[in-house]
């Protein structure tokens, strides 16, 4: 395994982490912005409200994308193990 292969696998792993973490982060950002807007418009100063709603939205997003996340991680791990096995 050359340095180029290691760099390629590392960049693929980092890209996979970025792509797989994007749905919960985007949902948390959008829901947080909407909750903040509603709180500003209604002058509600409850800080736990935004946290609870964001937490619920992120958990729902993780449940909704769990199959996709698992498939992507499994295929990446399988590909990596096949490449490592081919070194010998």
From Swiss-Prot:
The question of whether Transcription regulation is a record keyword is answered with no
The answer to whether UniProt assigns keyword rRNA-binding to this entry is no
Give coiled-coil spans as residue ranges: none
GO CC terms, sorted: plasma membrane
Q: Which GO terms describe its biological process?
A: bacterial-type flagellum assembly; protein secretion
Cellular location of this protein?
Cell membrane
Keyword annotations for this protein? Cell membrane, Membrane, Plasmid, Protein transport, Transmembrane, Transmembrane helix, Transport, Virulence
Topology in membrane:
Multi-pass membrane protein
Query: Main subcellular localization, coarse class?
Result: membrane
Alphabetical list of InterPro entries matching this protein: Bac_export_3 (IPR002191), T3SS_HrpO (IPR006306)
**Residue ranges crossing the lipid bilayer per the database entry:** 15-35, 49-69
Q: Entry's NCBIfam families?
A: fliQ_rel_III
Family listed = Belongs to the FliQ/MopD/SpaQ family.
UniProt function note? Component of the Yop secretion machinery.
Name of this chain's protein: Yop proteins translocation protein S
What is the protein's species of origin?
Yersinia pestis
